[in-house]
């Protein structure tokens, strides 16, 4: 069986441990991850989905929870929104937090 998991921000060290282009460790996180869902909650939801035979789950809160629905309903709008966020410096803004 296969379970597709679409997670939002999960409170982990993944961002801190990420590598920069030069191979150095990023060493910082951002507010979205620092305030994300507890990993134990994510694991519980995944296990429950496996146990009950789900095929796909979204584990997200707030705006992140609406992204899969928007992608299904109007993918072009979603891509345009993400493109505008990136052009507006989204990555730099969350890194500065």
Give residue spans per PLM region.
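SDR active-site lid
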Residues: 1-62
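Conserved catalytic loop of SAM-dependent methyltransferase domains
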Residues: 60-71
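Short, solvent-exposed helix-helix connector turns and helix-capping sites enriched
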Residues: 73-75
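Non-catalytic terminal and boundary segments that flank Rossmann-like NAD(P)-dependent oxidoreductase
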Residues: 78-97
